[in-house]
Amino acid sequence: MSCQQNQQQCQPPPKCPPKCTPKCPPKCPPKCLPQCPAPCSPAVSSCCGPISGGCCGPSSGGCCNSGAGGCCLSHHRPRLFHRRRHQSPDCCESEPSGGSGCCHSSGGCC
C-alpha cells in the first residue's frame, strides 16, 4: 500500500449527529390569572365630586366653588357679561351631559 492509501484509511470518520434528540420539557398547563377588578374611577384630583370637596387638579383649571359634582371648564370661560352668575368662571355647577362630574383631559365635562 502506498502512503496515500494509508492516510485515507486512517482519517477519523465524520462525526455523526446524535441519534436521540433532546426531549422537550413538558408544557405547563396555562394558569388562570385572577380576574382583574373593574378599572378605577379617575383620580380625585381630576374630579369635582362631593368627596373631593369640589376641587379639580391644576391640569383641569383649578377648583370649583361648590362640591356639588360640578366640573372644571378651563377652556370655556364665560365672557365679561356672564360674570354676574354665581358660578366660578372655571366651573360648571352640574353635569350638563349627565356625567359623573369628572373632567376630561381637555377640561370639559363628561
UniProtKB/Swiss-Prot annotation:
GO process annotations (BP): epidermis development; keratinization
Keyword Magnesium: no
Expression triggers: By calcium and UVB.
Residues forming coiled coils: none
Highest taxon above the source species: Eukaryota
Tissues where this protein is expressed: Skin-specific. Expression was readily detected in adult trunk skin, adult arm skin, fetal skin, penal skin, vulva, esophagus and tongue. Not expressed in the cervix, rectum, lung, colon, or placenta.
Pfam short name (any one): LCE
Region (Disordered): 1-22
Bilayer-spanning residue ranges: none
Bias kind Pro residues: ranges: 11-22
GO terms of molecular function: identical protein binding
Keywords: Keratinization
Classification via InterPro entries: LCE (IPR028205)
Biased composition regions of type Low complexity, renumbered to the chain: 1-10
Statement: the UniProt record of this protein carries the keyword Cell membrane: no
Note: Belongs to the LCE cluster present on 1q21.
Similarity comment: Belongs to the LCE family.
Protein purpose: Precursors of the cornified envelope of the stratum corneum.
Entry protein name: Late cornified envelope protein 2B
Gene name of the encoded protein: LCE2B
